[in-house]
Amino acid sequence: FPLGIAFLYFWSLYGGWSIVADGLGADSQQQHHYLYWKVFPVELNEEYLWTLLLYALFVLVIELTLLAVVRSDRPHMDQAAEALWISHTVLLVIAALAAGTSFLIVKDQLATAVLLGKSGYSVTRGGLGEMVPLFTLHQVLNRVALFSLAIGIGVWFTGRQGRWLAGNATLVTGAGYSVLLGGMFLYVTALGNKNELFSALILGGFFHLANTRRVKWGFVGAGAGMMFMGIGLVDFLRAFPLIDLWEGGAWWDAIQWVPEIHASNEAFGAHLSLYGALYFHSPLTYGSSLTALLFSVVPRILWPERPGDIYSHYASSVGIVEGVGEQGFSIHHATGWYLNFGLPGLLFGAVLWGWIWGRCFNAYLCAEATRDRGGRWRYAFAVMAPWGFVAYIPPLIRAGLEGYKGLVI
């Protein structure tokens, strides 16, 4: 819960400190001002005051809902209970197939990026004038591959002694995880997909802590440090042309930049969205996200004019040009609900968020008690639910209510 609340604070309110400080004449040392001419300038006016108040209200309602939903009577956990046995081979095959299919979707765009001297991040996100067909499926497959590796590696290091899930940790499967993880790191570096890598780190790390009977903090710290460095590298290298990554010169610059990752503008893109909606008086859509969510089961390649999500409405209402391929602007989850149903929608969205999060944790607490009644799949879902939800907070907080589709998948 503390990490999840920290995520909410970071993407909701943290960026406000720098904006207010700079607006009052101080120097926050944050390099976010370029967003003002790419999106819109921010003034310390009434709209920005309401932006901060509504974000704070959104986070507070989530916390209060959690307090109301999470069980206070925790069932007894039998430490000697037998864990559910999983197959590392199956997880490796799933990860390999998902990664391979994802690559097939974007291989032509990556080849074009090499020829034109562009970054993979740019060309796969509209830098060539249009989005990649099946881009959403590509993103889902990326997460499937990384999450399968995260779960598998977490279980591999607990071996046969896992509390919830266990498996036969052989050198062959360990080598398979190493090769696939290295390949996926190079792949997401070429794509610039740092958020998927970050979510996988959270899922694998927290599930390992929950699953192991004896925490090796030195190992956990070393693993977290290496992954943090990897995320920093991806964040820096995502803007480089693919040919520069191949030649290798950019990697040393990226390693030197990693300690400066705190200066990333990650906290500002979504934070600005509610201010934009209030300042430009963006009209409410009264449920367009529900329509978009319903019709999203049809791939856009089959229905090019499929109703757009709430970000498209937000972007058009504040004057952001979509598909420019240079900047991954996003919308805050609270803004998505606000643009659908106003203040009641924002409050309902916060309650729904807290209720789902609390139910995920309750399912984990009751996993052992319901194992015989629910079957293997329900048990596996229960023991993974809270860690999976927290791992998905970074992408969910930067999406409208349509983001729940990705959570379910």
Please report, for each region that a protein language model flagged, where it lies by residue.
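Aromatic-rich transmembrane-lumenal/periplasmic boundary elements in polytopic membrane proteins
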Residues: 99-112, 219-309
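Membrane-interfacial loop-to-transmembrane alpha-helix junctions, especially the N-terminal start
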Residues: 1-22, 164-177, 370-386
